[in-house]
Amino acid sequence: MSWYDIQAAALVPRYEAVQPAALHGWWRDLLPASPGAVLDIGAGSGRDAAWLATLGHAVVAAEPSSAMRQQGQRLHPDHRIRWTADALPELAGLLQSGLSFDAVLLSAVWQHVPPLQRARAFRKICTLLKPGGLLVLTLRQGPAPAGSGMHPVSLGEVEALARDHGLMPVRQMALPDQQGRPEVSWTGVALRLPDDGTGALPLLRHVILNDAKSTTYKLGLLRALLRAADGAAGWPSPRARRRLCCRSACWR
């Protein structure tokens, strides 16, 4: 039996007392304007899944704790929410389902993934994202309750994983603890998987940024351009694009 199964009766009222609109207001505008498919990993009491459903989205709520899952189904009986027992780092059922999502939320979850399993977990999350999809994580700083299975997290680690998988940083925010614990604080991170209109760009970015053949000058050039684009505030101006096109023609 997990710590969350044992603590469910005490945790659920505390979770439900937090207003999700206030908790997630820092990234609310990044969600699809039209109804989409959203995955809530570590859905807990279903508070956030229910909020996302009221915004019109179809939500898959993944919660491995049976006690938390049962409470969530009781408190939020919404036909737009589909519950599953899937958990990181495997997410086996979701990966086998063939589903993909416009947004994936990990709210107060990443600290439960053991450090040695995070690269694998991140790769599987990215597999579930649609091109153009949004990934939102909150990172916990502060002492962990005894027996909760929490591990230290860092923004730098998440940023490195994002670069390795071709995700673009969209927003970062320092957040207070909504339960009023002075010793606990949070960092919110929003990332997006680029979309070239064909669905091929995420794969190409991953190959270009991680291929071991660093001696090929064309691959090196592409890698440099992608890393420069990762750090740019926006797309090049039309004049800059024309200059790049002219230079590309000279190199061919």
Task: Describe the residue ranges of each PLM region.
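A conserved beta-strand element that flanks and buttresses the S-adenosyl-L-methionine
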Residues: 105
